[in-house]
Amino acid sequence: MGKEKSPRRVADNEALSVGTQIRGSAQKLNLVAALIRGRKVEDAMNVLAFSKKAMAVDVRKVLASAVANAENNHNLDVDALVVKEASVGKSLSMKRWHARGRGKSTRIVKPFSRIRIVVREQEEEA
């Protein structure tokens, strides 16, 4: 007895990794995600390593996790992996208060975002 195994969320030749609560807005994270969409994994890692964007560090960690999932959990060839999907969305927002003049205050919103990276094993062309 027990629970039935849930179906996979991606195809058999794909692997998935999700990064939640990445500090920064979804708009800024999407700029970095656009750099790697459709690229080979090795190429995408190099682009992220030399990017000046601060969020590139977090995206690189999520991409490395997706590659590790592909290699260890799904037995896919790491050299043939391509970034199929890099989707970005909003997560929670931290609310803080900033003291202003004349006894007033202003609300400061510190946003968090999430990223979902799917890597796919590309077939060899003969």
Swiss-Prot record:
Coiled coil: none annotated. Transmembrane segments: none annotated. Keywords: Ribonucleoprotein, Ribosomal protein, RNA-binding, rRNA-binding. GO terms for biological process: translation. Disulfide bonds: none annotated. GO terms for cellular component: cytosolic large ribosomal subunit. GO terms for molecular function: rRNA binding; structural constituent of ribosome. InterPro entries: Ribosomal_uL22, Ribosomal_uL22_bac/chlpt-type, Ribosomal_uL22_bac/org-type, Ribosomal_uL22_sf. Signal peptide: none annotated. The keyword 4Fe-4S does not apply. Belongs to the universal ribosomal protein uL22 family. This protein binds specifically to 23S rRNA; its binding is stimulated by other ribosomal proteins, e.g. L4, L17, and L20. It is important during the early stages of 50S assembly. It makes multiple contacts with different domains of the 23S rRNA in the assembled 50S subunit and ribosome. Part of the 50S ribosomal subunit. HAMAP family: Ribosomal_uL22_B. This is Large ribosomal subunit protein uL22. The lineage of its organism: Bacteria, Pseudomonadati, Pseudomonadota, Alphaproteobacteria, Sphingomonadales.
